[in-house]
Amino acid sequence: YFDFLNQSNLEKEIGEALIFLFIDQIRDLKNANEPYPTSLRGINWVKFLSVHEIEKKSFDRYLYSQYRILLDQIEYHLLGNHLLENGFSLIFGGYYFKGSELYQKGKELVSIELREQILNDGAHFELSPMYHKILLQRLLDTYNLVKNNKDVYQDAIFEKLLRDTGKKMLSWLESITFSNGTTPRVNDSTEGISSESSELFDYAKRLGFEWELAELSDSGYRLFKGAAVELFVDYGKIGPSYIPGHAHSDTFSFILNYKGSPVIVDPGISTYNIGYRRQRERSTSSHNTVRYGKVDQSEVWGGFRVGRRAKAVITNESADSIKGYHCGYKRFGIYHQRVFNFNQTSITIEDNMVAKNQLLGKSSAYFHFHPGIEVKIEKNRILVDGCNLNFSGASSTRIKEYTYAHGYNDTEKAKLVEVIFRERLVTEITLNDVKAN
């Protein structure tokens, strides 16, 4: 992708040498000519060559040939963030080469896909905070390019689309960013890939963006904030329906931060390689929600595919509570209903397995703790640093080990609690050393 070209301490000569080396070895690089890496690499090369005012015909010839190939290989078959990246890159190529065909095609793609992919509350429709931040940065870069190069192309309508969409995306991002600056690691999200929220906010402000916090809606994500505790809940749908490749089987999962530190966490992702680890990281039991028997809510398979899927419905919500159900176990005649009630000193979670007929089998509720947190069990009570968990309706409770992913190929063992129940489970999380206002 050549993202390293954007490093402030990278010497111009080293960047040039690496570009030369890449061009020389391109025939041996199996995936380098795929449209997605070509798109990202093109943007990074244009930025690097422009910032350093490098004019080399060999670079330009190769880069232009790559853009001609990209024009014929736009990723209509993959759609989603790939198609937006194709469009953004073609716009950069159009400005760099003053090529109307590149620019017009890129503008067409971006105009159509922004309207398709950005939800009403500002979330990117793949519902991954990581990809949301990546695409927001790309949008800000494109807005910067369009705004400051009107001698090349000028389109007030397109500029306004970028500005208005950017405001919505910034608003959503601020609404789901924790006080410690991190974002929820839901669906395919992990650290060290995208820019931090604060970096994007600062960049947007330098470009003249102003935005207000909007109410979270379509994404299904909610973030409850107290003086010392933050509770993120996921009542979103598998999204989008026609390309759910980055979705997990995680309906009604949640994340709990206490005094700015993670306590109950999403285990995250460590690989995109299709296999056991990828399957496990997308499964219901790898999230803080309920699994009926040994069945996932949504049938994740093949690394990036989803079969039958849970559809979440929010039935009631307020400033400190949310209630809903999903149909992921409909084929067994069961609906899972989950209610969160939030206040400054405690959180109550009520799970009901609503059956049309007699309920057969048991369910498991999972609670994954951040590495380093000591977890102790006392009857139906869990003791951890910062909070206690009490369970009503549990058949049994046990502590298990799981693999927490700090990032790609970077994992660590941690503790989880599995609570077995039949029809109804009430979990009360009591926060220590917190006084009600």
Stretch-by-stretch model annotation:
Residues N33, T38, P244, H248, ...:
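Short alpha-helix boundary/capping segments
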